[in-house]
């Protein structure tokens, strides 16, 4: 099993901000109040407005569920017994097969947001995912952390390349579901996604497996917060092959916990009431219509 590389304090702080949004809101409020005291009354309102606008700008880009640039779906309707497990950054031949085995054993369905070049390198896993009743969706071609800030033309090519890989490997039309790398969104990315007719899918429950990959801790975090309608984020892939091997055990514990709670795991399209992949318009027709 691959060892997990220790995270730098700066990166740990970054993930803390991203996945603990209520605490982020509290921290930001304290910053605004501190700015109020520092600026004094004469500059109170201009200073507060500037700080609030800065916070909104950061939130619109960084928060995965933000719909500032493009409509983003983070969960399904409440009140039911369905939830959706989603897996990012795969497929990984050292991890994904074990995850699929756990899903099969528990009669669960899931959605795999794949990196295009990973799918092209391991097409047999993509075909297996679909054959076993799961859904393959788009997580970009190469998962560059800077790609979210590139111009529209570059992002259109990057995303559509992954779309074509999905269609070629699975033999199905694309699901039209896209999850940006690390969940960030920008104006140019939104225009590219909109031109391709994709729906942006985020999540409402994060396993925080990128920070703490212990399967018991991952399952505990998910089961503590999950309710009907939630979309859960996990990772079956990483830049270092095999690093997410704890994912399969976490999936087992999560599925057992869901059963105890009376919840069932379905695909994202099923949770959201979207049509199945075969009912979608082929991607090349959409691309020919681009300006």
Question: What is each model feature region?
Answer:
Residues 2-85, 93-101, 105, 256, ...:
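N-terminal pre-catalytic segment of deacetylase/amide-hydrolase enzymes
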Residues 14, 184, 189-226, 263-274:
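His/Asp/Glu-enriched short active-site or ligand-binding loop at hydrolase and phosphoryl-transfer sites
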Residues 59-147, 158-161, 165, 174, ...:
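Active-site beta->alpha N-cap acidic-glycine motif
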Residues 90-94, 114-122, 145-153, 179-186, ...:
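Acidic-and-aromatic substrate-binding clefts and catalytic sites of carbohydrate-active enzymes
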Residues 142-144, 206-207, 237-240:
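A short, flexible beta-alpha/helix-coil linker loop
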């Amino acid at each position: 099993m691959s060892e997990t590389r220790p995270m730098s304090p700066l990166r740990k702080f970054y993930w803390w901000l991203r996945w603990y949004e209520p605490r982020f809101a509290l921290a930001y409020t304290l910053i605004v109040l501190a700015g109020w005291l520092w600026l004094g009354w004469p500059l109170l309102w201009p200073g507060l407005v500037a700080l609030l606008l800065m916070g909104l700008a950061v939130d619109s880009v960084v928060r995965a569920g933000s719909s500032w640039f493009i409509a983003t779906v983070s969960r399904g309707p409440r009140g039911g017994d369905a939830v959706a497990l989603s897996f990012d950054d795969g497929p990984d031949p050292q991890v994904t097969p074990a995850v699929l085995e756990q899903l099969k054993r528990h009669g669960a369905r899931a959605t795999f947001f794949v990196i295009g070049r990973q799918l092209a390198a391991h097409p047999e896993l993509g075909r297996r995912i679909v054959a076993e009743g799961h859904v393959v969706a788009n997580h970009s071609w190469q998962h560059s952390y800077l790609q979210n800030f590139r111009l529209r033309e570059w992002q259109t090519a990057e995303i559509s390349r992954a779309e074509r890989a999905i269609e070629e490997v699975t033999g199905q039309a694309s699901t039209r579901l896209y999850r940006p790398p690390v969940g960030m969104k920008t104006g140019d990315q939104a225009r590219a996604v909109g031109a391709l007719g994709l729906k942006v899918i985020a999540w409402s429950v994060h396993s925080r497996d990128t920070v703490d990959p212990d399967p018991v801790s991952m399952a505990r975090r998910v089961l503590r917060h999950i309710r009907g309608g939630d979309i859960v984020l996990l990772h079956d892939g990483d830049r270092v092959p095999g690093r997410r091997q704890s994912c399969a055990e976490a999936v087992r514990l999560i599925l057992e916990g869901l059963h105890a709670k009376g919840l069932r795991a379905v695909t994202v399209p099923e949770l959201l009431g979207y049509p199945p992949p075969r009912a979608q318009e082929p991607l090349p027709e959409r691309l020919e219509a681009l300006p």
